[in-house]
Amino acid sequence: VKLGASLDGRTAMASGDSQWITSPEARRDVQRLRARHDAVLSSAETVLADGASLTVRWDELPASVKASYPKETLRQPLRVIVDSQNRLTPDLPLFQSEGPVLLARHKVDGEWPAWVQQLTLPLLDGKLDLVSLFMLLAKQNINSVLVEAGPRLCGALLEKGLVDELVLYQAPKLLGDEGRGLFHLP
């Protein structure tokens, strides 16, 4: 799980505004992390709030990575989006960028571009079964998953014991008591 936070442990303002809390160096390092993982996992809420594409952007990779690997070898990770309420639509930036997308949902809907696959998951306590999602990813040999999501999905993954590593980028800023926290835990 990758998180960016302020000194007071907040990931966003109370309004939800969260872009560019961390430094350009941290953002370059995130590109490196994306490039080395099989998949990037996020939520519909994060995709809608940030307009995220979750791709590896060559121009933003650290110089050391660019020097070691030719641009033509760049591989886009599978982007896995948890969308339990079928809120996402094909016109979002995520679906306009290169690379495969897997939508984890309770029900399949609509017509999607060829590179978008919908995966139905069972509900467990009214939420998508995240353990089933990770088991299905493992069956497809997707074993390294970078999570870039908000406090709800990150907290659920921690609660289910599905987190092996936390990467925290801390910015020299204060967002205040009303800001959003790192995790929603029961």
Question: What do the PLM-derived regions correspond to, one by one?
Answer:
Residues 151-152, 172:
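Conserved beta-strand edge residues that scaffold enzyme active sites
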Residues 1-3, 166:
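A structural signal for short, well-ordered beta-strand segments
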Residues 3-7, 11-144, 152-155:
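Active-site ligand-binding patch in enzyme domains
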Residues 160-186:
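Flexible, gly/pro- and Lys/Arg-enriched active-site loops
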